[in-house]
Amino acid sequence: MTFSGNRALTVVAVAVAAVVLAACGKKEAPVADVQVIKIGHVGPVSGAIAHLGKDNENGARMAIEELNAAGLKIGDKAVKFELLAEDDAADPKQGTAAAQKLVDAKVNGVIGHLNSGTTIPASQIYNDAGIPQISPSATNPKYTRQGYAGVFRMVADDVHLGGTLGKYAVETLKAKTVAVIDDRTAYGQGVADEFEKGVTAAGGKVVGREFTNDK
């Protein structure tokens, strides 16, 4: 799932709010009084979907620059936000390694990961370290149903997205029979499965399920 620059600004703002809990004022302060807040970002900046990860990271960097230019303060201290970026290559093993690296760097919060497959295993590492994590695009319902208080998402999960679309197809578009095509990716299949459930629950009938890919 793609993630625009504007949404990146929103995610960073929400992440900062979750980390610092308060921010106000724009007065200059001596360097000694500046508090550095480290924000981690993890996404695939190598591999097949590197373009999405790079877009996300660039958006986060822009947001950090805007926040620093605003001269925010927490209490009586000026704050400076610092972005620490890691590549997970959309691979769960590399994702957990990146997560541990950010924990070791003592980040205050993390934006990431992009894929549910990397976000979910990494979330345990952040949770155990007491570091809040917000994913801009992980849609697997399991992510926010693990009982971790510090995990957040910026998008609807597969159940809400696919299920609502299925209900809409039957109740609003008046579709009685529906055929479903998905691309067999974890994301595509997850949404399609929930779409089927939504159609059936609304009284419609799924008459076929086909698959495709990017070839």
Give the location of each predicted region:
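Beta-alpha junction/loop-to-helix N-cap segments that form part of ligand/metal-binding clefts
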Residues: 26-31, 51-55, 73-145, 212-215
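Bacterial N-terminal signal peptides that target proteins for export
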Residues: 1-12
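Signal peptide-proximal N-terminal region
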Residues: 58-82, 200-205
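Extracellular/periplasmic Venus flytrap/periplasmic-binding protein
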Residues: 97, 140-142, 149-215
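Aromatic/hydrophobic pocket-lining residues that form π-stacking "cages" and hydrophobic walls in ligand
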Residues: 60, 122, 195
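Residues that mark the start of a beta-strand
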Residues: 36-38, 82, 176-177
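C-terminal motif of bacterial Sec signal peptides marking the signal peptidase cleavage site
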Residues: 19-23
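Extracytoplasmic "Venus flytrap"
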Residues: 37-61, 86-92, 114-117, 181-189
